[in-house]
């Protein structure tokens, strides 16, 4: 759910700020990016309004659950690093799962640091630290303690 709302808000920004530049300059764009541009061009104001409501509710919830001075630690992804040469379809499915874990920082304007701290049988597994608003420097300093 969070990844879907993030996609809508990001797509809305692309529609407002990037698509006019693309239409004016006609740059060469990869098929994958072009597909995302087309998706963004179809986002409606109602979808953006609903996504903004979700975002505001999420910010309120995170402010209560993770007040100033606290740091959340959680897995960066629900799986280890993708394998080299993995096909686009598999990567696309993995990307949505990944976005459900990493889009909280973009949705709440909080700093997040991800580090490859752990390892499982298939490769490195990242952990993320999520801080409170404007705690970027403090979060970076916490890395020395890990």
Model-derived features with residue positions:
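Small-aliphatic-rich amphipathic alpha-helix that forms the alpha element of a beta-alpha
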Residues: 93-115
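Short, surface-exposed loop/helix-turn segments at secondary-structure junctions
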Residues: 81-99
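An anion/phosphate-binding loop that grips the pyrophosphate of nucleotide cofactors and donors
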Residues: 69
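Short helix-loop capping/hinge segments that flank enzyme active sites or metal/cofactor-binding pockets
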Residues: 3-54, 116-124
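Short gly/ser/thr-rich secondary-structure transition/capping motifs
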Residues: 52-60, 95
């Amino acid at each position: 759910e969070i990844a879907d709302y993030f996609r809508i808000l990001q797509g809305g920004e692309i529609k407002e700020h990037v698509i006019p530049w693309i239409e004016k300059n006609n740059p060469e764009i990869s098929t994958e990016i072009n597909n995302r541009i087309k998706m963004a061009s179809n986002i409606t104001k109602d979808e953006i309004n609903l996504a903004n409501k979700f975002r505001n509710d999420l910010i309120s919830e995170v402010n209560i659950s993770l007040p100033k001075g606290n740091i959340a630690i959680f897995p960066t992804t629900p799986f280890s690093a993708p394998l080299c040469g993995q096909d686009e379809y598999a990567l696309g499915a993995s990307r949505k799962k990944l976005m459900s874990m990493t889009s909280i920082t973009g949705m709440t304007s909080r700093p997040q640091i991800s580090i490859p701290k752990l390892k499982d049988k298939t490769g490195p597994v990242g952990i993320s630290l999520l801080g409170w608003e404007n705690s970027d420097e403090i979060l970076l300093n916490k890395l020395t303690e890990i």
